[in-house]
Curated annotation (Swiss-Prot):
The lineage of its organism: Eukaryota, Metazoa, Chordata, Craniata, Vertebrata. It comes from Xenopus laevis. It is found in: Cytoplasm, Cytoskeleton; Cytoplasm, Cytoskeleton, Microtubule organizing center, Centrosome. May act as a 'capping' or 'branching' protein for keratin filaments in the cell periphery. May regulate K8/K18 filament and desmosome organization mainly at the apical or peripheral regions of simple epithelial cells. Residues 260-426 are annotated as: Trichohyalin/plectin homology domain. Residues 17-143, 169-304, 405-485 form a coiled coil. It comes from the Eukaryota. GO terms for cellular component: centrosome; cytoplasm; keratin filament. The keyword Manganese does not apply. Its main location: cytoplasm. The gene is tchp. The keyword Cytoplasm applies. This is Trichoplein keratin filament-binding protein.
Length: 499
């Protein structure tokens, strides 16, 4: 007799404990590995964000712009220098050409006559005397201007006015320079504000995009989790159904074993009754035995009918056919049971010879009915066994498909988790980079403000120091001139003017 197949969850307690310990250790190792990965990830994120913030900071941008402006100024100076050099080369070339022409003229004029040279000498002498006379008149005029008190007062007032105008021009230039610095500072602030607004808008768009992606991912994850739960429920249901089918198969095998045992008992009883030759009692016992067999077959068929009613997922046509076959077999057995009871009631009225004849006749009928009943029961049990085997195969296929779907969903969930982790990592890196950039910009602005204040204070100190030094020099010069008194000025001999 084939033993029933045990389900997969009937293991010993020691093996269950070993599996639990192994799973616990694997989970601890997985958690440690995940913690190490997370720690390494945050370290790398900090390094990347710091470098990215340093490279994308306002200070780095300002350095790049300053270097660009300096390079541009150098190029402009270089172009200006080249232009001036070119102009100087042109002037030198023109002078060389003029000198060459003069030398050529001199070579040509050497052969002129002496009279022309004397005439030229007289003309030069008269021109020199005229210039000397004019220079003497100019010197006398300058001496008269210096010796005239009114003219000196006018010159002093003009000098004071010139000094005041020069101071005003310096103040105006300083104010203009300060206005230019303020305008440059305002321009930089406007550029910084514009860049900050653009960064805020970009951050806002990125945040909205990430929110949409997260919402879409959350919907997908929720759908996958629900599908995974359904697959788990389906797997549990299929497993339970397989256990029920195995149990039914085992029960059918037990029923067949009981019928075989009853058949053996019947044969032994027939042998003993045949030897006793007590026909009436033997027929009664035989009738009771047949009734017991019929009752047993009736119970088996009732159990099969109840099992068929429980199997709701079978195909309707096959299920109705199986129920109809079992019900018909049950009806036949009930009719035979009723007939045997009537036969048992007729035994009391029979004599010995009649009982012997009836016994032979009944024995033939019983044998024929038993063979027919056994054949029908075998067909019913074989059909039931085939149905259970088909359902077990379908259940195994469904379980395999459920396992594949569950593995696929788990892979998708793992991919979604990794994608979410990468998105969070990028978001943290961007936040850190923006925060570092803002801090660097604030520090740069504060440093520029301090440098501007220090530079302004130094310029004011230098300006005040130069003013004090000039006042001291003027006071010393005035004291020296007062101590010396008036001194007559001497003039050197004027240079001879040659054309």
């Amino acid at each position: 007799m084939a033993l029933p197949t045990l389900p997969s969850n009937w293991h010993s307690r020691s093996r269950v404990l070993e599996q639990q310990i192994v799973r616990q250790r694997e989970q601890e190792a997985r958690l440690r590995h995940q913690w190490d990965q997370t720690n390494q990830y945050f370290k790398q994120s900090n390094v990347c964000s710091s470098k990215q913030a340093q490279w994308s900071s306002r200070q780095s941008y300002q350095k790049s712009m300053n270097a660009f402006h300096q390079e541009k100024q150098k190029e402009e100076k270089k172009k200006t220098l080249e232009y001036r050099r070119e102009q100087l080369r042109k002037l030198l070339q023109e002078e060389r050409d003029l000198l060459e022409e003069e030398l050529k003229e001199l070579r040509c004029n050497k052969e002129h006559n002496v009279s022309d040279m004397r005439q030229r000498t007289e003309e030069l002498k008269s021109a020199r005397e005229e210039r000397q006379k004019q220079l003497a008149e100019e010197l006398l005029y300058e001496q008269w201007k210096k010796n005239n008190v009114k003219l000196r007062e006018v010159e002093s007032s003009l000098f004071k006015k010139h000094v005041v105008d020069a101071w005003g021009e310096q103040i105006t230039a300083r104010n203009q320079e300060k206005e230019e610095e303020d305008m440059e500072k305002k321009r930089l602030e406007n550029e910084y504000e514009l860049a900050r607004r653009e960064a805020i808008e970009r951050m806002k768009r990125d945040k909205e995009k990430r929110q949409q992606q997260e919402e879409e991912l959350a919907r997908v994850l929720k759908w996958q989790m629900e599908e995974l739960k359904l697959k788990d429920l389906e797997a549990k249901k299929l497993k339970k159904e397989q256990e029920d089918l195995l149990r039914q198969q085992w029960e059918i095998e037990e029923l067949e074993e009981e019928r075989r045992k009853m058949e053996q008992c019947r044969k032994k009883t027939e042998l003993s009754h045949f030897l006793s030759r007590q026909y009436n009692a033997q027929m009664k016992r035989r009738a009771q035995q047949v009734q017991e067999e019929l009752e047993m077959d009736k119970k088996i068929l009732s159990a099969l009918i109840s099992k068929e009613d429980e199997d709701q997922h079978l195909q309707s046509a096959r299920r109705e056919q199986a129920i109809a076959d079992v019900a018909w077999m049950k009806h036949v057995i009930e009719e035979q049971l009723h007939l045997e009871r009537q036969r048992e009631a007729e035994l009391d009225t029979l004599f010995r010879e009649e009982a012997k004849q009836v016994w032979a006749k009944r024995e033939t009928e019983w044998e024929r009915e038993r063979n027919a009943r056994n054949r029908l029961m075998k067909e019913v049990l074989a059909g039931r066994q085939m149905q259970i085997q088909e359902r077990i195969e379908r259940n195994q296929l469904a379980q395999a498909e459920s396992v594949m779907n569950r593995e696929r969903l788990l892979r998708q969930l793992e991919e979604a988790r990794q994608f979410t982790s990468r998105e969070k990592k990028q978001e943290e890196e961007q936040k850190t980079a923006r925060r570092t950039e803002l801090e660097a910009q604030i520090a740069e602005q504060l440093l520029k403000g301090k440098e501007a204040i220090v530079q302004q204070e130094e310029e004011e100190k230098e300006f005040k120091l130069a003013e004090d030094l000039e006042n001291d020099l003027l006071q010393q010069e005035a004291e020296i001139m007062t101590q010396r008194g008036y001194q007559k000025k001497t003039y050197s001999r004027p240079r001879t003017a040659w054309s």
